[in-house]
């Protein structure tokens, strides 16, 4: 039973801004949760409530979200059974907040950051009440098998561009994906060895300054285009000895360089007043992706087009979707209504699952199940602004999605998730298996 939800503003996430953390006091003890924060956010995401008071944290404070927990949510939680996850989530989202857009519940009154912190803490309390691990409890909530469980392939973001880096590179993330490993533990070893090899290659080619790391632990050397980044990755994978065992994934984050008036994409968007020679139409971008997939071992492309460019998403999925995972992040924002539209338009074939995009554990599970029911892949994801909370590590095992991206094997807030997955793999023993190259298949 819930006794008293306590909360604190002053924990920082990884970019040095405050975020919401909750301590949920129950008859079983105290259960804590902290929420992450994105940088390149989709316009259809549930609202992350910030104070916009420029005198505190340059407007990034979360006092209003904290106040909403204290004055609106907390009084309604006292005495409730923490095992009633769906009932409590729906109460917060639909009754206490109640804000809505054409895409569903928007959390614009209380803030998705306020609601999600409580939702995560309640989930942890529910697991304790059921005397089980968090990953098995969430699996039960989702109606999944808890006897044999799946460890995910890590998608390690090792080269940064786009809005995450100060270089010229337009595409936001280049990831290494160790699909050829026999276990999660070995996959992380493959990934770490490629990462350190890449660091040496970057240092030789671009200088020691180029090995500074970005928000997610990846490198941001002065790379000019995707070909250069991919050549560097292929060379590092080969030098580390993992050719054919480690593949490549990209997050383009194309909404960041889309011009809605001209319906074009500027691959030189970080150069002010550029000569427009790298401006592409949607079709030209489709052709570029097809060319890259033919030349490099790319198995997944996330956000290849703007969040409203349904037409070109569908073209690309039709062209290469059989062999390559086309992932919707800004396109879908973990929103079941957006997923339904994408299914109707055959726009993509995979969901990027970010719990803070939708704002409650119940809705995140719903988005995952809808995607899996329609034979999509699902990649569980961190945000670029993270805390040491490891909830998503348990979530990816619970939902059997077979793939997770939570940064490079660098920076403690990233490695915290990978370390939790090491622990889960160890605890499962023979009852856990590694997704490997079957990460796109239904592992239910």
From Swiss-Prot:
There is a cross-link at residue 136 (Glycyl lysine isopeptide (Lys-Gly) (interchain with G-Cter in ubiquitin)). GO terms for cellular component: cell surface; cytoskeleton; food vacuole; nucleus; phosphopyruvate hydratase complex; plasma membrane. The modification Phosphothreonine is found at residue 337. This is Enolase. The modification Phosphotyrosine is found at residue 137. One of its GO terms (molecular function) is magnesium ion binding. PROSITE patterns: ENOLASE (PS00164). A motif (Pentapeptide insert) lies at residues 102-106. Glycolytic enzyme that catalyzes the conversion of 2-phosphoglycerate to phosphoenolpyruvate. In addition to glycolysis, involved in various processes such as parasite development and invasion. Plays an essential role during ookinete invasion of the mosquito vector midgut by mediating the interaction of the ookinete with the midgut epithelium and, further, by binding to mammalian host plasminogen in the blood meal, whose conversion to active plasmin promotes the invasion process. Its cofactor is Mg(2+). Belongs to the enolase family. One of its GO terms (biological process) is glycolytic process. The gene is ENO. The keyword Transferase does not apply. InterPro entries: Enolase, Enolase-like_C_sf, Enolase-like_N, Enolase_C, Enolase_CS, Enolase_N. It is found in: Cytoplasm; Nucleus; Cytoplasm, Cytoskeleton; Cell surface. Substrate binds at residues 164, 173, 302, 329, 381-384, 405. The active site is at 216 (proton donor), 354 (proton acceptor). The pentapeptide insert motif is required for the stabilization of the apo-enzyme in an active closed conformation, independently of Mg(2+) binding. The motif is also required for homodimerization. This motif is only present in Apicomplexa and plant enolases. It catalyses: (2R)-2-phosphoglycerate = phosphoenolpyruvate + H2O. HAMAP family: Enolase. Mg(2+) 1 binds at residue 40. It comes from the Eukaryota. Mg(2+) 2 binds at residues 251, 302, 329. It is a peripheral membrane protein. Binds 2 Mg(2+) ions per subunit. Mg(2+) is required for catalysis and for stabilizing the dimer. Unlike for mammalian and yeast enolases, Mg(2+) is dispensable to form an active closed conformation. Inhibited by high levels of Mg(2+). Signal peptide: none annotated.
